[in-house]
Amino acid sequence: MRQPLPTAEALAWFKPFIPQSKENRAAVRTAISAVAAVLLAFALHLDKPYWSGMTTVILANIYTGSIIDKAIMRIAGTLAGAWGGYFLAGYIANSFLLYLLSAFLLVTIAVYYYNFSVYAYAYLLGAISAFIVIADLAIAPEQAFWVAVWRPIEIGLGVLVSAAAAFCLFPINIHEALDKEVGQVFTGFQQLIRAVQDNLLLRHSAVDELRKNMQAFKKSVVKATDMLGYMRREVGFKREKIDQLRVLFDSIYSLNRSLHFFISSQQYASIQAELKTTDLPLAEVFSAIIEDLDCIKCHFLKQTDDGKELNSTQALHSLDAALSVLTARNSQHQQAVFAISHLLRQLVNKLQSLQLVLVKGQKFTAPHARLISRKQRLQTDPDIIKHSIKAGLSVILALCFWLISNWPGGLNGLISSIVISIRKSIYEMKNISLYRLLGCLTGGGLALCSLAWIRMDLYDLIIILLFGVWVFSYFSFKYTAYAYIGLQANIALIITLAQAGGPPIALDPPLERLGGILIGITSTFLVANALWRSDTLTQLTGRLHKLSRYLHYNVRQLLAPEPQKKPLYDLTSLFWFCRGLLETLEQEGLPPKKLSVFEEAKQDFQNQVLLQATITHVYEYINQDKCRLAAARAGWDLRALEAEVAALFEEKQVNLKPGQVKKQLEALRDALLVAAEEENVSADDMENSVVYLGSLMQLAIIAEVMARNNQWVDDVNQEQAAAGV
């Protein structure tokens, strides 16, 4: 009788040898794919097999979708760049001036598009591939055609191996990891709701601490949203899930912004004090919202539907009934109750939309937003143009140094000038240069020590390459802040060991690459310090000044008459960039003079965050036309007051009187409350009007604060201009 195979026992025996953590599994996958790519390149007798191995470690990532997305752009950029460089080489081969000019234009244009294109990596690889073909004209012009042919083949082999390994060898799918992220997003937002409730009703936590928690939560939502872009490259899930997750993350992000606006408003302290003396079922509404979040999460993850209505809907109806009784009896606390009811209504409405999309499966149609996108804004940004020109000049200087020094084989290292110069500040350039050197020395050192102690054959090469790439890849995945060191160590190791024909017989490749890296670093820092120098603090003050101009423009357009309105700027990326600069400067030891400028910059940034929150709140949640009609019925011209608020944000401010504007807005609010009692205006209309007038008052207060504090920007700019910075 045939005995069944002991499958379970065999799997149990192998289990200790199967990597468990996702970092270790990805590292093992990377090591095996690198060795496989190098061996295939040997078998196919490719001229430079290390390009195949390098491609696998450059594409390495924990998640399958990220690898495939990057692989597509790498092969597309390489093909376009290599053949574009070859055809361009035919026109410039006899002119040194055209040789330098073409290299400059290639890098400048590529870096320009790298700054805002969704295909940034493809543009960068295209420039690097074309640069390699063109730069080699000075040394071996007869090789241009073969470089254009074989380089894409060598890189394409690495791409195919990486893609196959990503799908077949320990695949880690983003859509599986995102289920965990979804749970964390729901849990994190529930904790924020509880914290806001405790702070508002019981004052258990400080507002500053609450803001920090909201900022940390916002980062986690952005991280989860970024993962969605790679999910479309994977298999095993419905495409509709991407749309659902995007709606979820966008909605939670928007609600987090509403909470931040509410607790950061100038009226928050008075709202707290007024609510303390009112008897409203606010705790019940908050509890219902938290329960509904948990219910939506469970149904979405399990793909079930119990058909029940949200608890928060009924809780909000009870609150509205209590508000009607309170406002009819006493109008003293109407500002506070309208503010909190407006916030809770936003939360409940968003939850209803999420239930329809995530649980009921309805398609979500996003409202059309007339915004000037990040791409449109950056296309004409002078800083982006300057940055691109500096990158092109860095490459030209590195190329000249290389030609003068006649350093053999250092062309691959010269790519450092491109990779380093795409960084936005000198601080980042210093870090990336140091990491590049450390990685080169570590990986090259391991290879050279192996060659010194072992008489290497093919089997030795496989073992050393497998072990080395695994260690460096695991380091990269585990310690993401220093991932670039591990990547460069892998590249140096592969370049040293994977030479044409088999195991290495010379020590030139790592030394040539090290020399090229030093040339690239030197050239980049010379250009960065000599032309449009931008240390981190200077860059921060400049970006804050630019952010202020964009925000002032947005306020003026938001309050402009409807026929004259223009699209607002989407400033999300600029805010994140400024926040990154602030976090970088907090880690640096600044001298006292710069420290005072930095503290002023932090305060100015906080004002701009509040201004942006106010603009977004009015843009997304307020019906301005209804407010104007309500004011007209009370005998007021709200457009005139809006024009006065907008005038506070004009570039040339004359006779600024924010205090008077604020008093007029308060008088209008009081008049509307009186008119509401006499004319029986609906609670929704009054809520809309009172909250809008509160937002206009907040804009007036912010204008006054920024007018006092922004003088330091002009002072700093004048000092820097006088110093020739």
Language-model regions: role of each:
Residues 1-233, 240, 337, 341, ...:
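A transmembrane helix-and-boundary motif of multi-pass membrane transporters/channels
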Residues 185-366, 547-725:
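Cytosolic, long alpha-helical scaffolding segments
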